[in-house]
From Swiss-Prot:
<comment type="function">
    <text>Acts as a regulator of the electron transfer flavoprotein by promoting the removal of flavin from the ETF holoenzyme (composed of ETFA and ETFB).</text>
</comment>
<dbReference type="GO" id="GO:0004857">
    <property type="term" value="F:enzyme inhibitor activity"/>
</dbReference>
<dbReference type="GO" id="GO:0090324">
    <property type="term" value="P:negative regulation of oxidative phosphorylation"/>
</dbReference>
<dbReference type="InterPro" id="IPR008011">
    <property type="entry name" value="Complex1_LYR_dom"/>
</dbReference>
<protein>
    <recommendedName>
        <fullName>Electron transfer flavoprotein regulatory factor 1</fullName>
    </recommendedName>
</protein>
<keyword id="KW-0496">Mitochondrion</keyword>
<comment type="similarity">
    <text>Belongs to the complex I LYR family.</text>
</comment>
<dbReference type="Pfam" id="PF05347">
    <property type="entry name" value="Complex1_LYR"/>
</dbReference>
<comment type="subunit">
    <text>homotetramer. Interacts with NDUFAB1. Interacts with ETFA. Interacts with ETFB.</text>
</comment>
<dbReference type="GO" id="GO:0022904">
    <property type="term" value="P:respiratory electron transport chain"/>
</dbReference>
<dbReference type="InterPro" id="IPR045296">
    <property type="entry name" value="Complex1_LYR_ETFRF1_LYRM5"/>
</dbReference>
<dbReference type="InterPro" id="IPR052000">
    <property type="entry name" value="ETFRF1"/>
</dbReference>
<dbReference type="GO" id="GO:0005739">
    <property type="term" value="C:mitochondrion"/>
</dbReference>
């Protein structure tokens, strides 16, 4: 694996690990799944395939950020708007 791709993969792993701290099923669950996925693909050497996997990881990262944003929004909405009808 080229050094530039290796750096991208490590950065992606660290970012996903950081985002996994607030995962709904728990940080340990997320960390275990993340490690398994990265270990499953550790033998991939084709640069194009590695770039595909990096793109998929970045997509997952964006989805997690959206999930956390929505969770915070829902909590805020529940605090300020009651569901009781007049």
């Amino acid at each position: 694996m080229a050094n530039s791709l290796r750096g991208e993969v490590l950065t992606l792993y660290k970012n996903l690990l950081y985002l996994g701290r607030d995962y709904p099923k728990g940080a340990d669950y997320f960390k275990r799944r993340l490690k398994n996925v990265f270990l499953k693909n550790k033998d991939v050497e084709d640069p194009e395939k590695i770039k595909e996997l990096i793109a998929r990881g970045e997509f997952v990262m964006k989805e997690l950020e959206a999930l956390y944003f929505l969770r915070k929004y829902r909590a805020m909405k529940q605090r300020y708007y009651s569901d009781t009808k007049v």
